Amino acid sequence: MKNIKEVILTGNDLTLEELVLVAREGYKVALSEEAKDSVLESRKIIDDIVENEKVVYGVTTGFGEFCNVSISKEDCKTLQENLIRSHACGYGPKFSTDIVRAIMLTRANALSKGYSGIRIGTLNTLIEMLNAGVHPQIHEKGSLGASGDLAPLAHMVLPMLGLGEAEYKGEIMSGKEAMDKAGIPIIELDAKEGLALINGTQVLTATGALAVYDAIELLKVGDIAAALTIEALRGIKDAFDPRLHVIRAHEGQMATARNILKLIEGSTYVTRQGELRVQDAYSLRCVPQIHGASKDTIDFVKEKVEIEINSVTDNPIVTREGDVISGGNFHGEPMAQPFDFLGIGAAEIANVSERRLERLINHQLNDLPAFLAKHGGLNSGFMITQYAAAALVSENKVLAHPASVDSIPSSANQEDLVSMGTIAARKARDIVDNAKRVLATELMAACQAIDFRADKGFELGKGTKEAYKVIREAIDFIEYDTDIQMYKELDKATELITNGKLLEAVEKAVELEH
């Protein structure tokens, strides 16, 4: 990531890495001078429309089915506040703080392009909230992903008006109290501003963007887990020979093969073709093809994310020439399909990891103790870890069903096909989280299996050696069930993935590709 303390918004060049810095590391945000000028120019056009009582959707008319109802100059402000109050109808659990911060950031970046007609002061209020850590409480459920994320974004706006709820310094309080404590004045919305703040795809985009970032990291962890399992099972290294992969030339496949070879470099655990057996099972032999396909999938989705976080998804838009154009940039379909694709890619990483876990614990498939239990019978060892992993991958298979093929018409059939992109993004996030736990289980089991071969004098590879060290610093070899509560050990392994310690340690020894 860039070594920066502040992210400058231009509306054109926000990166996924910068989004993560703001969302998770608390980096500050500021508008570029170019963005300020663009916002001011676009606002002049809206002021002219209101002053001259021109008919423009969402400025001097009602919304959705009420687009044919004219609104007087005197009621334009009331129209915008009414919009926020009525549209804030989310339900269910609240988004995590990092997602809320990503939502606020991406909405501010879209508005900074200067096509929405918002006042500079209103945009600055949103940025001040982000910088001060006033985080609106936004429900996860209630968006169709078209017209954008209306309900959840309305919840984002409520504290700006002294309404709703927000988290501030770790405490949930009323929106007004949070704004007062942070020293940020409550605002009144002017013409077009309510619509400008909520008509966009930022909730689905922010949720999916963080899932993409986590999936990229997780795929590297997947390669580490696979390499450790290959060593634990004395797998055949010939399957990763670059001569095999260059003749199929998918980037993800070739990168995965190179990663495995880097990780196992110098290993005496691995074998050659014909040494112990002629071929390994698919879950070992086909790691480049399986992991590689997911890498290519996620690279595609990342490309789409970086377009979307620098896009205008408002309606109507205000052009540089002074025209106001109604269109459909709020429609979430361009991201709904990629986020469904992301879920499929992440689910497959968990699928193959669980299959490798089975090969580690099933004594009928290896020469290791049943369920990796040193004293089996009285002790069950890793028996039920596979049950738990199987439950997660089966849940992922349900979650991987695409949301974007579904639609329910809304607003009296004016909005007759919607994207369900926010559901797609939320599902992808959950799939990535489940996959993390499955990989953590495989990593633990692989280290347990390796310890059963410790007396044979084998050496781990250049990269896997570092992974093994990090895991063993946190988690001991499990000899007796009475020594542990398995979920706590799995929690430790999962945290090594979440906090990045595992990947950081390995990448100091070998540079992994994505």
Swiss-Prot record:
Record cross-link 5-imidazolinone (Ala-Gly), residues: 146-148
Keyword Lyase included in the entry's annotation: yes
Protein EC: 4.3.1.3
Residue spans crossing the bilayer: none
GO cellular component, one term: cytoplasm
Protein name: Histidine ammonia-lyase
Pathway linked to the protein: Amino-acid degradation; L-histidine degradation into L-glutamate; N-formimidoyl-L-glutamate from L-histidine: step 1/3
Single Gene Ontology MF annotation: histidine ammonia-lyase activity
Family stated for the protein in its record: Belongs to the PAL/histidase family.
Gene Ontology biological process terms in this record: L-histidine catabolic process to glutamate and formamide; L-histidine catabolic process to glutamate and formate
PANTHER family in the record: HISTIDINE AMMONIA-LYASE
NCBIfam families found in the cross-reference section: hutH (TIGR01225), PRK09367.1 (NF006871)
Matching CDD domains: PAL-HAL
Reactions this protein catalyses: L-histidine = trans-urocanate + NH4(+)
Residue numbers bearing the 2,3-didehydroalanine (Ser) modification: 147
Keywords (A to Z) from UniProt: Cytoplasm, Histidine metabolism, Lyase
Localization terms from the record: Cytoplasm
Pfam families: Lyase_aromatic
Post-translational modification: Contains an active site 4-methylidene-imidazol-5-one (MIO), which is formed autocatalytically by cyclization and dehydration of residues Ala-Ser-Gly.
Top EC class, one word: lyase
